């Protein structure tokens, strides 16, 4: 700082995915792997409030919509698209694993442009004005990538502590709550005049009483599951799209014929044996078995 260094008896580390200070303190001994990081990239597009409410079917200005899109939008690779409304803007983007982008030599802005031109997305942002383009790295390793959460004079929160639930797209809430709990612990340390790891261990105890550590432990196998089962990003979304399209359409065919075609559509993409194994693996990853 131009005004000099700032000293404090306790520091709450909120440095995000680039965990330089966390490493310097010896709370973690490695960089996060690209396979455990997602890159979220988006455009913020300006539209007037009335247009947003009309296009998204919002009855009141206090209401909003968040949409998640799975499958072709990420080229069938691990990732997901999103659209969410703000009062006078719409945010449109995708999240894809960093190693996937590198392996397939994909340029994020080209993938995003393809997404924006999708017939389901383009009408929502038609005639809008681009205000921002941005990207953000998100740690998705979860439980296995968490550093030690406290030491003498310091606590680690949010993305810096890999507090992200990839399945439920939770991270902001965990950052806010962990920051609050760290602040409560810091206040207690000030009252005691003791900023040692013994006192700051109260931060982890507070986390254990809530949902963050419980959920991260339960879903500790989920990131690995996504790495080894790309079918859930490409094969199965495509199948469900075709199956539901057929199910809710009137073709003038006997329903037995329709169900036979749906069944054949699945087995053409994935054998029943493998599909059953995929379901079991997903259950284990989600339930933490």
Per-segment meaning from a language model:
Residues 1-126:
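Predominantly flavin-linked oxidoreductase catalytic cores and closely associated redox partners
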Residues 14, 24, 185-192:
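Active-site catalytic microenvironments for nucleophilic, acid-base chemistry
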Residues 187-289:
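C-terminal helical "tail/cap" subdomain of flavin- and related membrane-associated enzymes
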Residues 20-23, 54, 166, 177, ...:
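Active-site-proximal flexible loops/turns
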Residues 90-95, 158-162, 181-184:
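Short acidic (Asp/Glu) and glycine-rich catalytic loops that position anionic groups and cofactors
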Residues 73-79, 100-180, 191-205, 209:
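FAD/FMN-dependent oxidoreductases across multiple families
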Residues 16, 40, 174-185:
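Short amphipathic alpha-helical face segments that pack within enzyme cores
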Residues 55-57, 126-129, 216-223:
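Short coil/turn segments at secondary-structure boundaries
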């Amino acid at each position: 700082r131009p005004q000099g260094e700032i000293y404090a008896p306790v520091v709450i580390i909120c440095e995000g995915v680039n965990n330089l200070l966390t490493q310097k303190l010896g709370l973690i001994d490695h960089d996060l792997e690209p396979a455990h990081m997602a890159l979220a990239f988006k455009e913020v597009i300006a539209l007037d409030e009335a247009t947003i409410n009309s296009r998204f079917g919002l009855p009141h200005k206090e209401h909003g919509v968040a949409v998640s899109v799975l499958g072709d939008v990420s080229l069938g690779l691990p990732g997901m698209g999103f659209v969410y409304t703000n009062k006078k803007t719409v945010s449109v983007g995708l999240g894809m694993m960093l190693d996937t982008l590198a392996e397939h030599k994909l340029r994020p802005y080209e993938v995003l442009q393809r997404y924006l031109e999708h017939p389901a997305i383009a009408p929502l942002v038609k005639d809008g004005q681009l205000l921002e383009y941005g990207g953000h790295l998100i740690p998705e390793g979860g439980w296995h990538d968490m550093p030690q959460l406290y030491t003498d004079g310091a606590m680690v929160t949010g993305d810096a502590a890999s507090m992200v639930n990839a399945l439920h797209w939770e991270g902001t809430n965990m950052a806010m709550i962990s920051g609050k709990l760290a602040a409560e612990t810091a206040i207690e340390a000030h009252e005691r005049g003791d900023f040692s790891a013994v006192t700051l261990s109260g931060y982890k105890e507070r986390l254990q009483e809530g949902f963050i550590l419980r959920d991260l432990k339960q879903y500790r196998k989920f990131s690995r599951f996504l790495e080894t089962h790309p079918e859930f990003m490409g094969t199965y979304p495509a199948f469900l799209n075709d199956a539901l399209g057929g199910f809710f359409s009137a073709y003038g065919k006997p329903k037995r014929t329709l169900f036979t075609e749906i069944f054949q559509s699945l087995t053409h993409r994935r054998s029943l044996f493998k599909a059953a194994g995929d379901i079991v693996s997903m259950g284990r990853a989600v339930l933490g078995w």
